[in-house]
Structures are given as C-alpha cells and as structure tokens.
C-alpha cells in the first residue's frame, strides 16, 4: 500500500533553501544576527605579501597574528575565507586628451582580452560570538515551565537545534554585541601597524554572504532590501545535489574537506594554494576550547590510548604482580600517541590553547572534468604537507552550508588543533595588488603590471606625499623602455614633464605628446642662454653667484675663491642689474668683475665656450612636456656642469611656480650617474628631493651605475630620499652593497638576481617588495620603443594619420606580442 506521508516526508524535511542558512538579519551597521542568537562581524583583511619576506619575517608575522587571535576566547567561532577568482576588476578612467585616451583604450582592451586568465586573491575573517542566551536556555526553559508551558517547550527545543528561531532579549543581544565589538577592535588594533583591517558595513557583509552561496556576478549583485530575513535575501541560486558534486546556479561545485591535519605546520605551509590558477574558496573554522575542557579532552584520549596500547587479551591473561612489563607486547604507535598528547598538555600549561579546527575547499567552474583535475591538484598539495583531503559526496551539502557563518552545527569535519598550528594555517599571507587609487593625487593608479601568479598589480610611485623614484638596472635591462612607459602613463594626470636625456631615448615620446625637444649638445643647439635674463630676485641672485662660482672654479674646483673674491663677485652681480637689459651679457660682466675677468675669459664670445652663455637673448623656454638632450658633453664635464646647473635651476623655477602648485610635475634624469658627478649638481638634486614634495613634484632617477652613486656619496642619500625603488635585471650586482644601501634581505636579493630582461622587475615601496612583469599592449609598445627602425615607422604613420590614429594603425598593422606567463595548469575556470 502506498503511503503518501512516507513519500513526502523527505521533501518536508529538506525544507526551503533559506531554512538551512542560520543568518537572520543586521543588528547594527557592522553586526549581523543569526537565528540561534549569535552575533558576528565580517572583516576584510588585506594580508601580508609573502613573496619578499625571509623566514624570520614570515615567523614574526605569524606570531603577531597568533597574539592578536588570543582576543577571541571560548564562545567565539573564527571563520577565515580565502577567495581566489578570475576576471578581476581593472578600472580605466576616460580622458579628454586624444593621445592619452588612445593609449588607455588600447590598454583597456588588452586586459579585457586576458581577464579570464587573470586572478585576484581576497581574505576575509568572520568573527562569530555565540549568544549568551542560547548557552543558558535550558535552565531558563525549565524555570518558566509552570508559568508558560508552551513557551518553555519551544525554548527547550530551540536549544538543541541550530535552525529554529529563539526568543531573545534585547539586553542580551546588546551585551553580546558590545563584547564582540570590543574583541574585534582589540584584534584590529593589535595588527594596525601591520595592516589596515576593514570592518565591513551592511552592504559589504551582504555582498560577502551572497558570494558564499552564489557564483554568478549578476546573482551576487544587489543591495539588502531589509535588515531582516537575511537568509532569504542572500540565497539567489538553486542548488541541485548530485552524487559527487553540486550544481549552484550555472556552476558545478566540488567540496573538499580536510581529513587529516598537516603533520608539521610552518608559515606558508599551504602557500601553493595561492599559485593554483583556478576559482575556489578555502574556508577554515576555529573554535577555541576552555582550558579545563581542553585538558579533559586530552586526558580522555591519553587514557584511551594507554588502555589500548597492550590489548585487552594481554591485560586479562597476565598477572600484573608477577609479569615483567618488558614481557608485555606494547603497541608502539599508541605509546607515541600518548607522548604526543603529553606534549600537548605541556603546551597547554605553557599558555597555548586548543580548539576545534576545520578546513573546507569549494571549487567551482563550468566543467566537471576540470574540477576533477583541480581536485587532484589540491589533494596533492595537502599530501605533500603530510595532510589529506576528502572529496565529499553524501555529506557535501552539510559541508557546503557549513561555510556560512553560524552554520557550525552542520560542520562535521572537525579536528583538535593548537593555536600555534592554527596561526600557521591561517590566511595571513597573500598576493597584494598594489593600490587602485592614488590617494595623494586623488586619481586612479599610474599603470597596471602583472605578477608571477597572474594577478594585476596597480603601480603608484607615491608613498604618501613623496613619489621620488630610483630605477636601477644593467645595460639592456630595459630602463629607458620602462621610463618611457611610466612617463606615457603619467600623462593621464596632465603633468608638467621635464626630462634630462642623453642619447635621444625620449625624443619620440616627446614628439607624440606634442612636447619640445631641445638639443643642448656640442653639435646642435636649439636655444641660447643669457644668465642675466633672470628677474632680479633674491633666489636668482643667489643662483647667479653659485653659477659664476662654478664657471670660475671649474670642474673639480681647481681654483677656490677667497673671501674678498666672493664679495667682489657678489657686488658685480648686483651692479649688472643697474645696466639696461640689452647690456646685461657675460662679456660686459667680465669688465666689471675685476681680477676675475681672466677666469671667465673662456666663457665669453672670444673664448672657447662663449657660445653657451654669452648671448644677448635667452631663448630657453619650457613647454608642458620638455626634454633636453645633453648628448655630446659626456667628455666635457667642465661644460656639462654649468649647463646642467642653469637648466636645472630654470626647471626648478617652473616647478616651484606658485601658479602651478596644483599641477603634478615629473622630472626624469636619465643616466643620472652622469649628471650627479659634480658636487654642485648633487647638492641641487638633494635639495630638490627634500623640497619638491611641497610643490607636488616627483624626481625619477634612472641609472645603471650604482658604483658612481656610491663613490659620490649619493647612494645613501638617494636610497633614503627615493621611497620607491625599481630594480631591473642585474645578475652581477654587488649583493652586499645592495643589501646595506637599500636594506634588502636575502629573498629580495635572490629575486633581483633572478630577474630576466626585459620586463621583469622588483618594485620596493616602504617595507614591501613585489616582483612584477611589464607586459605591454601594442599601443604602449609603439609609444615606448625608440630604435631607429621603429622610429621610421612611427614617423611615416604619424604623417599619414596623425599621432592618435597613427598609434592605433601601428598597433593593428604591427601588433606587439607580450611575454606569456607560465602557469601551473592550462585550464581556467570561468
């Protein structure tokens, strides 16, 4: 006989999907409430980039986290979530400049085409506090039995189920919320100097919960419609259970749980998880036990193993008084377990804590075959760490629902773990993506690069208010190419750009952006200089005094002015401004400077270098993109020094112009070691690095010779003044000099030594370093390249189509093929 009640019973017990979610609603802007009376907060944890840390730094970071996690004692559930997903958000703003927009648009298309193979890593913590009312409800239910039998029965039932609503008092909830908030704030403060942890608001938590139960972007998007019924609102996908996988919306889900813990934990024990190119969620749950309960659990297991190590038959068949203990067969494995448990007791006595720990991995994609392959890869990681994973089948729904905060009653895969081991397995280390916004300029990032793990890295030169940058690399490592790339991306800020070039590396880029390229070499001069054309200000008079002192004393200061000569020089400079402007020339100046006339003879029209400064007019002017080519003066330092000094002063006046205070400025010294050989120029550069921050200016020094910086005494100064350092390939570097000058550890030195040109670099900012790859699109390449063959093509296309359209046509006709990053697997889940 067919009994309908038996047929529909499983359907009734399965209930609606939201019935399996223990979330109830939002209590405050940052606190959520569960149906069982628990309160919780969700934290966005930026993490620490592990790539450049040595072993001691890794251990220090873990110890800091271990100490901070002690804020959460018995009654807390600490959930940690590691999200890795493809198609990261890479924002690109729109720009009015057609050339800038052409470059940005091509960069946008370049990354859009490869978004399926790019990933992002996110870390979240959820701190859940079990409600105080739920822990004392049995006694309360018995106490109210005679005055309210129905309510008492309902309350009594609610204590033994996790998905039934409980009647809670506001005072109890408020008390729990205050305690939770205090503990979370203590946790955040302990790590405040380490990383900036964000407590998610209502919208952030809603999106987080939806991401746990939905895998399509359109299903995750949305806002909470009410502060209640959160279980109903976050579920936005159907779930179908198959024998060995789930179907959630349009995705196939595989759930793996940790069956055996890693035998010996250490920092970055599971770092291989970060390197797998796949979409997944890794979730851990940690529930600290009270000290007395922890000891009780350990002793219970010690007694069990002690009783079972000799076997029941051996114990019954031997007389304990007459039998030698050495004659009894002992299970050595059980004895080892007893000793390990004894070590655990000693650890508890030393202040460590024991807790329930579980780890769940959720793989998602659209191909079951790919997920099967990934499952094997994940299992291999744990096997190599002496642990093991179990692929869930009949328990997969429980395991999947258990990743939602508050669903701890469904978590059936728990292991005991010490807090020190838990800290090692915590999600602390990550792959930092840089900063998407430049907080100082209030704009988007400077440029997008890529990491070894196929994640985007958003580069900003600024560290706070300072953007001075040092670029170091051997010949052929790509310094000029990188500098061109950085300058072309910086044009999105509409800056004043000044470049001191040697050899014409930036001539093409200057033309592309409509700048002025002036040759200041011996063979060609595009401007004339008259130092006395400067307005009569205190700063300019002081500069002229230093300038003529350089002319008189010569390179290496072969002649030194005495006190009387210094006074005579100053008086002569002041008297020059009594003459008519047309009479203010170097030749006339020598007539009133007295005995110093002979020292200045070679700088007059009748002398060797009179063409440089002895001119009636000064035609030197600055455009928004200004490049000076000093090619040809490398072998004449006595001329290069005053020429640089004058042009540098004029550029500095442009930078310090109060009318341009709101404009960002970039000053690039290519082959900087040639420019700072002279003490006067060095002092000027040092002073500029100290003061240009106030004028919203950044100085970029590109050089291949660290030896020249060291011998000139500039190495320590530049290392301190340039908070951003970009190291390109240099396998023959002096490791000890690099270590001492830039405070690099062995890991960072190894990374620099292993860089492959062109394109690979190590970017060091503040106390962190990141190895990245410069993979350019075709337009960026054609803007940055500067060899003769490419320059001829650019000249032809620019004449035919204009600059903006010419770049687009070059990219279409001669596409550039960027370097392809190697990944551990060829399959990618969408």
Where are these regions (language model features)?
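P-loop NTPase motor domains
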Residues: 48, 55-71, 293-300, 387-388, ...
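Hydrophobic anchor at the beta1->P-loop junction of P-loop NTPases
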Residues: 471
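Walker A (P-loop) phosphate-binding loop of P-loop NTPases
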Residues: 476
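Hydrophobic positions on the alpha1 helix immediately C-terminal to the Walker A/P-loop
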Residues: 482
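Short beta-strand-centered segment that lines the nucleotide-binding/catalytic pocket of NTP-utilizing
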Residues: 495-507, 522
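A short helix-turn-beta junction within AAA+ P-loop NTPase domains corresponding to the substrate/partner-engaging
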Residues: 515-518, 714-727
């Amino acid at each position: 006989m067919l009994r309908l009640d038996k047929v529909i019973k499983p359907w009734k017990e399965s209930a609606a999907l939201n019935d399996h979610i223990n979330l109830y609603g939002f209590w405050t802007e940052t606190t959520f409430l569960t149906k069982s009376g628990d309160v919780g907060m969700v934290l966005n944890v930026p993490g620490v980039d592990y790539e450049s840390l040595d072993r001691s730094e890794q251990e220090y970071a873990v110890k800091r986290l271990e100490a901070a996690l002690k804020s959460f004692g018995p009654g807390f559930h600490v959930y940690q979530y590691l999200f890795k997903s493809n198609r990261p958000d890479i924002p690109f703003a729109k720009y009015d400049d057609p050339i800038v927009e052409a470059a940005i648009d091509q960069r946008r298309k370049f990354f859009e085409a490869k978004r399926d193979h790019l990933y992002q890593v996110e870390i979240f913590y959820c701190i859940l506090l079990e409600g105080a009312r739920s822990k004392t409800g049995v006694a309360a239910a018995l106490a109210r039995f005679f005055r309210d039998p129905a309510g008492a029965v309902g309350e009594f039932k609610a204590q033994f189920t996790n998905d039934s609503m409980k009647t809670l008092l506001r005072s109890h909830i408020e008390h729990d919320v205050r305690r939770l908030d205090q503990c979370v704030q203590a946790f955040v403060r302990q790590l405040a100097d380490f990383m900036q942890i964000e407590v998610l608001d209502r919208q952030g938590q809603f999106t987080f919960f939806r991401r746990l139960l939905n895998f399509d972007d359109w299903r995750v998007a949305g806002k909470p419609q009410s502060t209640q019924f959160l279980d109903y609102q976050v579920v936005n996908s159907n779930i179908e259970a198959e024998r060995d996988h789930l179907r959630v919306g349009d995705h196939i889900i595989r759930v793996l749980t940790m069956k055996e813990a890693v035998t010996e934990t250490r920092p970055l024990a599971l770092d291989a998880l970060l390197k797998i190119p796949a979409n997944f969620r890794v979730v851990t749950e940690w529930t600290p036990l009270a000290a007395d309960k922890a000891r009780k659990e350990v002793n219970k297991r010690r007694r069990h193993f002690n009783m079972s190590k000799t076997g029941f038959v051996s114990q019954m068949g031997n007389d304990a008084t007459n039998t030698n203990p050495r004659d009894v067969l002992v299970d050595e494995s059980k004895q080892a377990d007893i000793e390990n448990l004894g070590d655990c007791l000693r650890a508890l006595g030393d202040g460590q804590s024991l807790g329930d720990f579980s780890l769940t991995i959720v793989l998602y994609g659209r191909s079951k075959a790919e997920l099967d392959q990934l499952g094997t890869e994940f299992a291999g990681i744990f096997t190599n760490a002496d642990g093991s994973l179990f692929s869930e089948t009949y328990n997969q729904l429980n395991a999947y629902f258990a990743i939602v905060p508050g669903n701890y009653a469904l978590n059936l895969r728990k292991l005991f773990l010490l807090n020190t081991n838990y800290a090692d397995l915590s999600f602390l280390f990550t792959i930092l993506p840089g900063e998407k916004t430049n907080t100082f300029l209030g704009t988007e990032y400077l440029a997008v690069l890529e990491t070894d793990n196929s994640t985007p890295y958003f580069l900003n030169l600024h560290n706070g208010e300072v953007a001075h940058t040092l670029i170091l690399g051997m010949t052929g490592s790509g310094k000029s190419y990188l500098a061109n790339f950085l300058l072309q991306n910086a044009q999105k800020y509409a800056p004043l750009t000044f470049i001191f070039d040697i050899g014409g590396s930036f001539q093409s880029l200057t033309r592309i952006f409509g700048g002025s390229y002036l040759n200041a070499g011996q063979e060609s001069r595009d401007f004339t200089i008259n130092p006395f054309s400067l307005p009569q200000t205190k700063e300019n008079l002081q500069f002229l005094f230093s300038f003529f002192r350089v002319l008189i004393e010569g390179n290496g200061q072969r002649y030194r002015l005495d006190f009387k000569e210094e006074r005579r020089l100053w008086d002569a400079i002041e008297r020059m401004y009594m003459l008519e402007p047309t009479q203010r020339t170097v030749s006339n100046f020598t007539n009133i400077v007295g005995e110093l006339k002979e020292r200045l003879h070679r700088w007059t029209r009748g002398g060797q270098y009179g063409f440089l400064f002895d001119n009636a007019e000064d035609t030197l002017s600055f455009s928004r993109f200004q490049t000076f080519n000093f090619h040809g003066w490398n072998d004449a330092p006595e001329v290069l020094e005053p020429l640089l000094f004058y042009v540098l002063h004029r550029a500095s006046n442009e930078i310090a112009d109060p009318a341009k205070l709101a404009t960002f400025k970039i000053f690039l010294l290519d082959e900087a070691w040639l420019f700072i050989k002279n003490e006067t120029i060095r002092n000027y550069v040092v002073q500029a690095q100290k003061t240009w921050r106030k004028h919203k200016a950044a100085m970029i020094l590109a050089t291949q010779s660290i030896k020249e910086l060291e011998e000139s005494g500039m190495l320590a100064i530049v290392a301190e003044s340039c908070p951003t350092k970009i190291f390109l390939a240099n396998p023959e570097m002096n490791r000890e000099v690099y270590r001492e000058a830039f405070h690099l550890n062995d890991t960072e030195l190894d990374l620099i030594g292993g860089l492959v040109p062109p394109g690979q670099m190590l970017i060091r900012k503040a106390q962190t370093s990141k190895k990245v790859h410069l993979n350019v699109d075709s337009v960026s390449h054609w803007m940055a390249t500067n060899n003769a063959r490419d320059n001829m093509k650019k000249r032809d296309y620019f004449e035919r189509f204009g600059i903006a359209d010419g770049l687009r046509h070059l990219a279409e006709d001669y596409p550039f093929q960027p370097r392809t990053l190697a990944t551990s697997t060829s399959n990618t889940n969408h």
